[in-house]
């Protein structure tokens, strides 16, 4: 069993422990629970879904990477599919604070990358900050999203973000978690003084980055982008750009890829190479921040691919 789960698992009821431990122990566990698994755990613990999420919050918080604040926040996104997705805050040494990921962003991005279509609720162990409330308002569930906090009655996002400004005010039709595929194609490599050759078209890192960019959410700037990361063991993780109506709460594609890596139990210091794919001649670029943050994590083979329709 992964050691980081041990303290949280020790606090659950014996019946729930018996049902939960084998799931966490499985080599393929990657920070989310399928609807059948959720039902099994609810029955074992005699809990409804919201109560189960509160019980599981310490497991989500165990994913936190907090070398700066040492303040661990966990969140669980509840999809309409019945699946549950863990998220936690992530901080990166030697990178700007703006690269930090909040737990709520982590859980939402995790659900998005796993193919969830809509969220019913978000359970979190601390009150969401204003940044996260604005990020949540980009979702296709909008202000109907239910926020669940310990020792408080569940309430909608509308109650936490009154008089909200969001994509609907800008007549944006495509919302975060809506299914979309822009079908971008590779245009040209923009590799910057790399000694390593650019990947060929059959490289899974290229196809993964292309697909991620095609499914990214950038309705304001049209600067769609995606990232693919390959670790030392050969595993590949995708990340998509999630733009926000308020701009600043936008989540870069590198961060969403790191969220997926963290959920899978991978070490972000083991990234061997990466590809950033972004739209040709777009008004903004993810390149400087992506390259700098990956360098801080010890990855120096970062390829830059421009895209066309």
Curated annotation (Swiss-Prot):
Binding-site list for substrate: 89-91
Bound cofactor: record note: Binds 1 zinc ion.
EC number: 3.5.4.5
One annotated GO biological process: cytidine deamination
PANTHER family: CYTIDINE DEAMINASE
Quaternary structure note: Homodimer.
Name the record gives this protein: Cytidine deaminase
Gene name tied to this protein: cdd
């Amino acid at each position: 069993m992964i050691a980081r789960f041990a303290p949280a698992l020790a606090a659950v009821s014996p019946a729930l422990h018996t049902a939960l431990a084998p799931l966490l122990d499985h080599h393929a566990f990657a920070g989310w629970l399928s609807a059948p698994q959720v039902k099994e755990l609810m029955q074992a613990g005699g809990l409804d879904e919201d109560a189960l999420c509160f019980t599981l919050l310490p497991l989500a918080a165990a994913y936190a990477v907090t070398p700066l604040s040492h303040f661990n926040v966990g969140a669980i996104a509840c999809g309409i599919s019945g699946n549950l997705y863990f998220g936690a805050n992530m901080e990166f040494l030697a990178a700007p604070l703006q690269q930090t990921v909040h737990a709520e962003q982590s859980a939402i991005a995790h659900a998005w990358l796993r193919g969830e279509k809509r969220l019913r609720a978000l359970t979190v162990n601390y009150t969401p900050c204003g940044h996260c409330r604005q990020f949540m308002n980009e979702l296709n569930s909008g202000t109907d999203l239910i926020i669940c906090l310990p020792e408080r009655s569940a309430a909608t996002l509308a109650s936490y973000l009154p008089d909200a400004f969001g994509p609907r005010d800008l007549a944006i039709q495509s919302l975060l978690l809506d299914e979309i595929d822009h079908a971008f194609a590779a245009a040209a490599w923009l590799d910057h003084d790399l000694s390593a050759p650019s990947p060929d078209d059959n490289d899974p890192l290229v196809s993964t980055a292309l697909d991620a960019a095609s499914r990214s959410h950038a309705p304001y700037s049209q600067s769609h982008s995606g990232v693919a990361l390959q670790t030392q063991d050969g595993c590949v993780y995708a990340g998509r750009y999630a733009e926000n109506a308020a701009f600043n709460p936008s989540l870069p594609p590198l961060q969403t890829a790191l969220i997926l890596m963290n959920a899978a139990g991978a070490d972000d210091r083991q990234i061997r190479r990466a590809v950033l794919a972004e739209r040709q001649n777009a008004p903004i670029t993810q390149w400087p921040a992506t390259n700098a943050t990956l360098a801080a994590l010890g990855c120096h083979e970062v390829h830059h691919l421009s895209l066309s329709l």
